[in-house]
Structure formats: structure tokens, C-alpha cells
Design a protein with these regions (language model features):
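Repeated loop/turn-to-beta-strand initiation elements of outer-membrane beta-barrel proteins
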Residues: 48-52, 77-84, 125-130, 137-138, ...
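Outer-membrane beta-barrel translocator domains and adjoining extracellular loop/strand segments
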Residues: 2-15, 65-69, 95-103, 141-146, ...
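Outer-membrane beta-barrel "beta-signal"
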Residues: 253-267
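Residues on the lipid-exposed face of transmembrane beta-strands in outer-membrane beta-barrel proteins
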Residues: 40-44, 68-72, 117-123, 130, ...
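Transmembrane beta-strands of outer-membrane beta-barrel pores
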Residues: 2-4, 56-60, 74, 88-94, ...
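Membrane-embedded beta-strand positions of outer-membrane beta-barrel proteins
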Residues: 1, 52-54, 70, 84-88, ...
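Solvent-exposed loop/turn segments connecting transmembrane beta-strands
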Residues: 32-34, 57-67, 164-166, 179, ...
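C-terminal structural cap/anchor segments
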Residues: 125-220
Length: 267
């Protein structure tokens, strides 16, 4: 894992590298060449109901990515509001995509495009939303997993859509907080319609379509333990395709459950 400092190029490929568009093993680990990266971010809130974010990442010789987020909320009663958001993501290969040799190239497609949106409702201790993400078939969305999680509205812990093209993702999220008890509970249910595991040009890691259920319970300590938070996370992933596939595309990928017990300290 990423437990030490890496050069930018060597940080890409620490985790699983998946396959090339022709199904052969990707070989970009320790073969990705870049002089570094630069990031520019702009946030603007013209009024209390509207907020904008724009981010641009330039990774020399690999890719350029632009991310735009627009969010709107509308108060509809005492401590209640409707919320809506739109995200647009455009990624383009630059230079060699990391390496001049195809099997060692990190970004093999010329571009990828993603659209994500949400519509929801919030009160002082309740929240619920419907979320949708579309990764077009323009190319595989490739963002180094070592650098963090996906930013899209359909993101669920222990879920990634990186390495995929032609995806339809639907997620319902609901949560309730209990301020006096310092407890919060969050539920998320998602359906992720993915290309065939044998469509290597659109499915880098051989992940089949799946349904996912997350239950997240948290307790925040106070007093001498102020800043400490405990978390119990349950995840279930179920295969959501009738396609006949090899066990290697099922084991540790779908038809599985996971429990995490975590202690976080927030400074």
C-alpha cells in the first residue's frame, strides 16, 4: 500500500494494475514517466443556495483532467431543504500517456467523460438522496487508485468505478444523526451496470455488474477522548448479471460481505 513517499510516476501502479485494452497484463508499474503534476482549484459561492467548484489536474506526459461541480439547495421549511448537484469530468491523454510502449502506457485511451448528478432532501438530522453516474463509452476512466477515492455522487465506501467505461450507476443514500447520543447511521444501496468482464477495452479490472449495500454506524466521543470516532461498516456486494463468467471474476469481487471496525482521530 501507499505507506511511504513515492515519486509521482512510481506512485502509479502500487496497487493492482489490471489489464490492457487487449486483455494482456498492464505493465505500467515502475514504467510510468512524468516530471510531476500540478493542480488548480477554484471554489465560489455567489449566494447561500448556490456553490461552484472547478478543479484541473495536469500530470505531465500522462493526462489532464478537469472537474466541474455545481450544487444548489432550496429551503422548503424550518431546517429543511432540497438539494441538487451536477458533476462533469473530462480526462484527456497527453504526451505518451506515461510510456511510449503500449503495454506500459498508463492512459491508453485518448479521453474519458463522466456525468454525475444527485437530487435529495435534508433536515437538521435526516438526509436522503438519489444519485446517478454515467461513464460514457468514450474511453476507460483511469485515475490512479493510489491517489484517493472517486469524487462522484454515487461513490460508496469499498466501491470504485475507476478503470471502467460505459457504466450506469444508481445509488440511493439515507442517513440520520442523533446529536444527543453523538451517533449517526447511514445506509446506501447501489446498482452498478458494467460492461462484460471480457470487454477488456472497457473493464480494466474484470469486475462484473453488481449490487451493493452499505451500512455505516458511527459514534463520536467527547471529554478527554474528544476527536475520537468509532465506526462500524458493513458491506455486501452481489453479482448482478446473468453472464456466465469464470470464478476469478467472482471471488473477492462479488457475492461477498465485509465488516470493518475503525477508530478515527480527527484533529
Amino acid at each position: 500500500g501507499t505507506v511511504k513517499w513515492y515519486d509521482v510516476g512510481k506512485s502509479i501502479g502500487v496497487y493492482s494494475t489490471g489489464v490492457n485494452a487487449d486483455g494482456s497484463k498492464s505493465e505500467y508499474e515502475n514504467n510510468t514517466h512524468t516530471k510531476g503534476l500540478a493542480m488548480l482549484g477554484i471554489t465560489h459561492k455567489p449566494n447561500k443556495s448556490l456553490a461552484f467548484q472547478f478543479w484541473n489536474i495536469y500530470t505531465e506526459n500522462i493526462f489532464r483532467a478537469s472537474f466541474l461541480q455545481i450544487e444548489l439547495d432550496k429551503e422548503v421549511g424550518k431546517k429543511q431543504k432540497w438539494i441538487a448537484g451536477v458533476q462533469l469530468f473530462q480526462q484527456n491523454r497527453i504526451g505518451e500517456g506515461g510510456n511510449e510502449e503500449l503495454e506500459k502506457k498508463y492512459m491508453q485511451d485518448k479521453a474519458s467523460f463522466i456525468f454525475s448528478t444527485k437530487l435529495g432532501w435534508e433536515s437538521h438530522n435526516w438526509k436522503a438522496s438519489f444519485n446517478f453516474t454515467r461513464i460514457t463509452n468514450q474511453g476507460r476512466y483511469t485515475m490512479p487508485r493510489e491517489w484517493g477515492r472517486d469524487p462522484f455522487y454515487t461513490f460508496m465506501p469499498r466501491e470504485r468505478n475507476e478503470g471502467l467505461a460505459n457504466v450506469y450507476a444508481y445509488v440511493i443514500k439515507a442517513g440520520k444523526s442523533f446529536p444527543k447520543q453523538r451517533v449517526s447511521a447511514n445506509l446506501a444501496i447501489g446498482h452498478f451496470n458494467l460492461p462484460s468482464v471480457y470487454d477488456f477495452s472497457a473493464n480494466k479490472y474484470g469486475l462484473p455488474s453488481y449490487n451493493q449495500l452499505n451500512l455505516d454506524l458511527r459514534y463520536t466521543f467527547n471529554g478527554i477522548l474528544s476527536g475520537l470516532e468509532s465506526q462500524v461498516l458493513f458491506v455486501y456486494k452481489g453479482k448482478a448479471t446473468n453472464e456466465s463468467i469464470d470464478d476469478r471474476y467472482i471471488i473477492n469481487k462479488v457475492n461477498m460481505s465485509l465488516w470493518n471496525i475503525v477508530l478515527n482521530y480527527n484533529f
